From Swiss-Prot:
One of its GO terms (biological process) is ribosomal small subunit assembly. SUPFAM superfamilies: YhbC-like, C-terminal domain (SSF74942), YhbC-like, N-terminal domain (SSF75420). Required for maturation of 30S ribosomal subunits. Gene3D superfamilies: Ribosome maturation factor RimP, C-terminal domain, RimP-like superfamily, N-terminal. GO terms for cellular component: cytosol. The keyword Cytoplasm applies. It comes from Aliivibrio fischeri (strain MJ11). HAMAP family: RimP. PANTHER family: RIBOSOME MATURATION FACTOR RIMP. This is Ribosome maturation factor RimP. It is found in: Cytoplasm. The lineage of its organism: Bacteria, Pseudomonadati, Pseudomonadota, Gammaproteobacteria, Vibrionales. InterPro entries: Ribosome_maturation_RimP, RimP_C, RimP_C_sf, RimP_N, RimP_N_sf. Keywords: Cytoplasm, Ribosome biogenesis.
């Protein structure tokens, strides 16, 4: 998570929570003139289009006042979806036993991409079973993590 993403998460957690939603996480993707702020929300009863619209209005109001992003961007608010992104240790703990796809910031054993089942979470270390071997990953070295949907 970048410094800006950390700042945005801290800024938006309370307003999104006040609406009754969990701020699962967010991503700010810079793509030249077309940057995007993706905000993922969840609720115990699921997320519907109306929920995304309500959260989007609230987030837009906060962003207009605080103005933390200096470039033009599009705001996308959605549920985490089938390929749910994992941002916090609690997310990994919630999905112990599920398959996850990881992309690392710094390679481990000459690999940046890993896929396996989440075995356990111990503080800031996630253990994933990859091809029968238990591999430990520091959350600080995980650039991107998503659940792998089962069909």
């Amino acid at each position: 998570m970048t410094g800006l993403e950390r700042q945005l998460t801290e800024m938006l957690e309370a307003p999104v929570g006040a609406l009754g939603y969990e701020l699962v996480g967010l991503e700010f993707v810079r793509a030249g003139e077309h940057s995007t702020l993706r905000v993922f929300i969840d609720h115990e009863n699921g997320i519907f289009v109306e929920d995304c619209a309500e959260a989007s209005r609230q987030i837009s109001a906060v962003m207009d006042v605080e103005d933390p992003i200096t470039v033009a961007y599009n705001l996308e608010v959605s549920s985490p979806g089938l390929e749910r992104p994992l941002f916090k240790a609690a997310h990994y703990q919630q999905f112990v036993g599920h398959e996850v796809s990881l992309v690392l910031k710094m390679p481990m054993n000459n690999r940046r991409k890993w896929k396996g089942d989440i075995l356990e979470v111990n503080g800031e270390i996630v253990t994933v079973t990859v091809d029968g071997n238990n591999e430990e990953f520091a959350l600080s070295n995980i650039s991107k993590a998503n659940l792998v949907p089962k069909f």
